Amino acid sequence: MPEQYRYTLPVKAGEQRLLGELTGAACATLVAEIAERHAGPVVLIAPDMQNALRLHDEISQFTDQMVMNLADWETLPYDSFSPHQDIISSRLSTLYQLPTMQRGVLIVPVNTLMQRVCPHSFLHGHALVMKKGQRLSRDALRTQLDSAGYRHVDQVMEHGEYATRGALLDLFPMGSELPYRLDFFDDEIDSLRVFDVDSQRTLEEVEAINLLPAHEFPTDKAAIELFRSQWRDTFEVKRDPEHIYQQVSKGTLPAGIEYWQPLFFSEPLPPLFSYFPANTLLVNTGDLETSAERFQADTLARFENRGVDPMRPLLPPQSLWLRVDELFSELKNWPRVQLKTEHLPTKAANANLGFQKLPDLAVQAQQKAPLDALRKFLETFDGPVVFSVESEGRREALGELLARIKIAPQRIMRLDEASDRGRYLMIGAAEHGFVDTVRNLALICESDLLGERVARRRQDSRRTINPDTLIRNLAELHIGQPVVHLEHGVGRYAGMTTLEAGGITGEYLMLTYANDAKLYVPVSSLHLISRYAGGAEENAPLHKLGGDAWSRARQKAAEKVRDVAAELLDIYAQRAAKEGFAFKHDREQYQLFCDSFPFETTPDQAQAINAVLSDMCQPLAMDRLVCGDVGFGKTEVAMRAAFLAVDNHKQVAVLVPTTLLAQQHYDNFRDRFANWPVRIEMISRFRSAKEQTQILAEVAEGKIDILIGTHKLLQSDVKFKDLGLLIVDEEHRFGVRHKERIKAMRANVDILTLTATPIPRTLNMAMSGMRDLSIIATPPARRLAVKTFVREYDSMVVREAILREILRGGQVYYLYNDVENIQKAAERLAELVPEARIAIGHGQMRERELERVMNDFHHQRFNVLVCTTIIETGIDIPTANTIIIERADHFGLAQLHQLRGRVGRSHHQAYAWLLTPHPKAMTTDAQKRLEAIASLEDLGAGFALATHDLEIRGAGELLGEEQSGSMETIGFSLYMELLENAVDALKAGREPSLEDLTSQQTEVELRMPSLLPDDFIPDVNTRLSFYKRIASAKTENELEEIKVELIDRFGLLPDPARTLLDIARLRQQAQKLGIRKLEGNEKGGVIEFAEKNHVNPAWLIGLLQKQPQHYRLDGPTRLKFIQDLSERKTRIEWVRQFMRELEENAIA
């Protein structure tokens, strides 16, 4: 820190300082410096949310003090939805800490500062601290949680939820990063542990936790009474059960209840200023007054527009927000510093700090000496120079760049470590640098050298989806759903039931078959059951118990599977035998190309890129599928592969399904390769015949490096001089003939296929190695999940949704999939929302006209596009963040997911409205589809969809058409299992036999209760999921894992659960030995061997001779044992010991 500062800080209330000449990251360095100087908290007021987020990242780079944001609700004033639970949690946590904040920076956007907040007394009065060893009755705690607004659920997933199971209580407190598990011993807290939401496993112990209320207002009985009486004083009461008053009276909180927050308190809501400690210093950047006035005008306009709904009468704006004049009179009560970029006139309260813009230092990739500008600046600047990069990965890239002009910067953590004429490097989020003329120091950020960098991904602490847990999981079975039993065929699930057989209670899965026949499957045999997935549920077959239709279908499928496996191996062998081209990787050129990518790559994206590059550098032909949700950056993977190909003087073909997409790829590729001597052309209906002929001639001569086009590229008159890479986008949109053409190219050209249609992981396992798969499941920077609503059509809902979007400067897709009446629909919208500028786009328009419409929409010349599903693939418009789909019940799930992916391509909250007719006018299937899509708000949910959407589009297509037939008869999961077994057998050089494929599963029956009691795991779906996992476990380790997880999540194992795991272990042993059946009872039991087994006959004969009173043969494959096993514990022990002896004497 320099000894003398260039400015003094205001101390008294109302005293102001204006500091000028702050450019680039100088604002952030200055706020950091103020935070270190000022003996109290600093509140930084930003003009809007975007600036607040950027400043948070930048300031954190320059100080070790705490830097916090007060989250904004991110809803419109008087909105009909509530903020996300995570936002409320973060706000409560910040508000709770604020009054006692000693030092540090709190950043608040103006409109959040204007919003009134809950009284401080409420937060402190309702916070509860729980410690290990504390005496606390569980019932009292549950009552307390209920009255604090926590929701009781079966499994804790979100903030504000709790679950109880026996002596355990799971709880996700507001303001906490992770949920906690409390273990009670009587009425004492025995242990407090943090656990992971996804796996539900505990992580570590803690001593105490702090419990904040679940909302920013009380929800206990007294508060609801107060709400009711204040409502009656303010508005009239409607009898309608949908009315806000009636809903709150019943104890349910309707969406958007936050805008009636004042009615829950007896005194008016205070401003945020009431939370600031007395020694707070305010700092503001940007034009406060304009931002505040704009916000006030918006609020007023919405109050007037929305105040007409008798079901939702509104409170006046002043009870929820400060007026602009109130805001400024509050500001006068505090010392305040204003930061300005311009030079200020000389006055006592003003100081100019002498920060100046850097000269233009951009790297000129196409020049001979790309780093000339930077080199000259460094030679002439005689103070320290600090380079700032965003991450370790970028640090290496910058290091390589600087090495070319012989500069090796030294790593520092703080700006004031820079001295003399040193060259330094620090990691942080600063966007633009500056020259500090007073300290004679220059800060150069990455974007000063490489052009605009766009926000890197703020690590979202929200959960990521683990696709494996979604697939083949029985946890979501509903009664009436089709399931496959390996031995009896496709039936319908009819629920779980407990039956008593021979005095032993067991839990069974009940299935119904044709003619109402029932089959009870013991839970130990759940490995024989899988969900039926292979087509629409209503088309699933229903087999007859004991009939031979199933065994015939299974036999046929197994034969088919064998052929498929052979075909796959054949393609693979051909690829392995044919030498592809091994590309050379010129790292320096490639790095320069990567540096001009304005986003930080996500971890999955980086993995996909590395996989593709290493495939291309192998002599084998590449065949890789990159699968990622819409807009997760698959195109960049393709561009880098194309760059490597062109750098090796090879040509690249990019094949896309539609002309619009071709145009978009063409524009993107042209932009991305703008600084490189690469020639890119496009072949599509937009080109005249003459242009096309010209292009084809140049392709054949090798003058064109990258050719983009629709299926025209596959015509026989397209000849490449030296094609090295074929990139196929959305392969499933091409017809069979086109696919055959692509298949023919496979063996000797590197092929990269991009798709957003999710392909289940299981498919990849079965194809192990046929086609390599990369999955991109992390969303790029600041993409929020798309909020999805399923609503009956209502013109007010439509008007609201369109206004919400256009008021924040965005655009709307209005999907109307009926070309005949699309004109009428557009006219109806124009009447409903006169503020909107509307255009129409559909597939039957003349191609050029459609192109013009899309282009205008892209350039924001109008803000509502009424269109058909033409927008389904790939058109990328970041400012379009609302999609409204009329008659959403007419779409398939995968299609709805694709369409929803058109929005939410920036860091604004995106909305998808699925409008439907009256529920009675929809099929149940359509209702289920809409429920499924609404439940999968998370980004990257494409994979989950593959399981929900049992249409599994990818499956039939990967292998050619006739496949999907056999898949429909036996179901997807079983089909995949058969295919996996067949591929393994063929790889090992064995001919796969049906026995091999539908291998006989061992039965173990010891006549003792073996189940997960429902008082141990009350939720039937969770129980079912565990049964399936136990039955399907292949190794002892897997069972051990499951056991640890059960104890961890539900407490000590009851005896029947222990027995269930023991029997599963015995089944694994018996299966390995080739034992078909193992029965035990009080007097002994029977072991039945399969024809092919690993039991040593000599050892067995010896046993029969030595102990004839205990063992005897009963037919050629049955061994009887006579033993007193009336004690259940000894029964398991004895059988386990006998199995061990069999294992020790097994033969190969």
Curated annotation (Swiss-Prot):
CDD domains cross-referenced by the UniProt entry: DEXHc_TRCF, SF2_C_TRCF
Enzyme class: hydrolase
Subcellular location: Cytoplasm
Keywords, ordered alphabetically: ATP-binding, Cytoplasm, DNA damage, DNA repair, DNA-binding, Helicase, Hydrolase, Nucleotide-binding
Ranges where the Helicase C-terminal domain occurs: 798-951
The keyword Membrane belongs to this UniProt entry's keyword annotation: no
Listed GO biological process terms: DNA damage response; DNA repair; nucleotide-excision repair, preincision complex assembly; regulation of DNA-templated transcription; transcription-coupled nucleotide-excision repair; transcription-coupled nucleotide-excision repair, DNA damage recognition
Record's signal peptide: none
Gene Ontology cellular-component annotations: cytosol; DNA repair complex
Keyword Secreted tagged: no
Intervals of motif DEEH box: 729-732
Listed Gene3D superfamilies: 2.40.10.170, 3.40.50.11140, 3.40.50.11180, P-loop containing nucleotide triphosphate hydrolases (3.40.50.300), Penicillin-binding protein 1b domain (3.30.2060.10), Transcription-repair-coupling factor, D7 domain (3.90.1150.50)
Highest taxon in the source lineage: Bacteria
Main subcellular location of this protein, as a coarse class: cytoplasm
Record-annotated Helicase ATP-binding domain positions: 615-776
Binding site for ATP: G628, D629, V630, G631, F632, G633, K634, T635
Disulfide pairings: none
A GO MF term: hydrolase activity
EC number(s) given by UniProt: 3.6.4.-
NCBIfam families: mfd (TIGR00580), PRK10689.1 (NF007966)
Annotated domain remarks: Consists of a compact arrangement of structured domains linked by long, flexible linkers. The N-terminal region interacts with UvrA, the central region interacts with RNAP, and the C-terminal DNA translocase region possesses ATPase activity. Activity is regulated by a conformational switch from a dormant closed state to an active open state upon substrate binding.
Family per record: In the N-terminal section; belongs to the UvrB family. In the C-terminal section; belongs to the helicase family. RecG subfamily.
Description of how the protein assembles with itself and partners: Monomer. Interacts with UvrA and RNAP.
Functional summary from the UniProt entry: Couples transcription and DNA repair by recognizing RNA polymerase (RNAP) stalled at DNA lesions. Mediates ATP-dependent release of RNAP and its truncated transcript from the DNA, and recruitment of nucleotide excision repair machinery to the damaged site. Can also dissociate RNAP that is blocked by low concentration of nucleoside triphosphates or by physical obstruction, such as bound proteins. In addition, can rescue arrested complexes by promoting forward translocation. Has ATPase activity, which is required for removal of stalled RNAP, but seems to lack helicase activity.
Protein known as: Transcription-repair-coupling factor
Species per Swiss-Prot/TrEMBL record: Escherichia coli (strain K12)
Lineage: Bacteria, Pseudomonadati, Pseudomonadota, Gammaproteobacteria, Enterobacterales
Gene, per the UniProt record: mfd
